[in-house]
Amino acid sequence: MELQELAKTLTMAPVSFLEFSLALLCLAVLYYLHVRSRRKNPLIPLDWPVVGMLPALLVNLPRLHDWVTSLLSTTQLNFRLTGPPLSGRHLFFTSDPANVRHVFTSNFPNYPKGTELAEIMDILGGGIFNADGDSWRRQRAKAQLLMSGPRFRAFVSRCSRLKVERDLLPLLDHVAATSTGGVCDLKDVFLRLTFDMTATLVFGVDPGCLTVSFQEVRFARAIDDAMDVLLVRSVLPLSWWKLVRWLGVGYERKMTVARLDIDGFIGDAIAKRRDAVKAGRVIEDDDEDSADLLSSYIDEDDDAVDDVILRDTTMNLMLAGRDTTGSALSWFFYLLTMNPRVESKILAELDTIKATTSTTLDDMVTYDPDELGRLVYLHAALCESLRLYPPVPFEHKGVVAAEALPSGHQVRPGDKIVVSLYAMGRMEAVWGEDCREFRPERWIGEDGKLRYVPSYKFASFNTGPRTCLGKDMAFVQLKVVAAAVVRNFEVEAVPGHVVEPNISIILHMKNGFKARIKRRRQVMNS
């Protein structure tokens, strides 16, 4: 009899579980319909009892940038996204210039980077990006002293022009002459170019990433892998990815391998530079003294700075220069292919300055960086591209003490403030009704000179005390590359190839940028 009762219970259990599950589902549907009917704005995600707004975030993750833009557009530039109660993921999104000015400048000490971000970005060590307080101030003062000096500025100009003339133009000329119809991935080309340029400026070494063979460089591959892992970490709760790291599996295993390659390359560069400085040897590059930042740090402090500090410093500088400039160039040329009117104006402006014709590159030309610095429309076009496609689409800040922001929203310790620069460039309240148009003229005043735009409105180079130290260097590189490519080649987007932002820490293109390259045949100034 007992066996029969037990059998009866077991056969009924699945039915009871099914009924229970259906009841839960019905309750969830009723809750959804009830909350939805009371929402004033249907675009705002539902805040579920246990998971918060996490389901909406996960569903919209593939189009995160445009989703956040639509939310901020419909919520007057500010929106609070709540995560699961114990996740620590309570994010306050903003694209309000007044809030940006307050957080990044007016009350700067109350909004540090925070220890959690430093843990996520541990590949950067104690470098300037992770540092707060006195450590950050010391590092910034030292970097500013070296990067603002005339010797380094001249080094940037010379290396940028030489790299374009020796490697970029010949490679594009080779692509244009190939049987594949002159098609290449310009995103890949520009990332390789800026990797070599940045490594030269930071380490005094050209890794040779930009070659006709498109060979893989382990150091470059390692940085790409590390960036992929950092994105995963930034989305997951701290305890989750730390457990995966402790287990040494999955993406964290990839980070371990990447760190070994990164530390190996940088360690070798540091050792060689120390030996050269101690031996009193002149580091030469085209018979001129090299002014790379690593040599300058070692020469300034000799043995006072240890290898760990040098490793962290150079890694931060490398990351700052390589991906951001490569991303900016990719989006700039994509926008030019969509707006031939702008390209024509840039070509006309280039005709007003002197070009240098190469005797070894089939009459292709390059430009002196100082001459390019006088061009207004080229600078405006680059700013307009950076407005629409900022290389760093999000800026993150922690909160020390509770207070009300200029928008009236309250923030508390534990909150994460996320500034969407991508969304800010698409806000009518900030840039007007034509905010989504690529229109360089918005940067030019009636007097024909560049119009002043406050950095808290155009924050592609950050704003406040943390304003990017490499801003001038970046514009030199962008202009040297843009002018040479526009003048010597016609760039056409391959029809049917979809270009859209990737979900990454740097605003890369999801599918790359397939473009057809053709030599431009016409009379040019010389």
Predicted stretch roles:
Residues 340-342, 417, 471-508, 512:
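Cytochrome P450 heme-binding "Cys pocket" and the immediately downstream C-terminal segment
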Residues 2-27, 82-92, 151-162, 173-200, ...:
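Cytochrome P450
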Residues 194, 198, 203, 258, ...:
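Central I-helix of cytochrome P450 enzymes
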Residues 54-79, 264, 268, 363-407:
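Conserved cytochrome P450 K-helix E-x-x-R motif and the immediately C-terminal K′/meander segment
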Residues 148-152, 227-228, 232, 256-329, ...:
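Conserved cytochrome P450 catalytic core segment spanning the I/J/K helices
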Residues 145-146, 320, 443-478, 504:
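Cytochrome P450 heme-thiolate "Cys pocket" and heme-binding signature region
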Residues 389, 419-449:
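Conserved cytochrome P450 K-helix/beta-meander segment immediately N-terminal to the heme-binding cysteine loop
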Residues 2-138, 159-166, 258-261:
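N-terminal membrane-proximal hinge/A-helix region immediately C-terminal to the signal-anchor transmembrane segment
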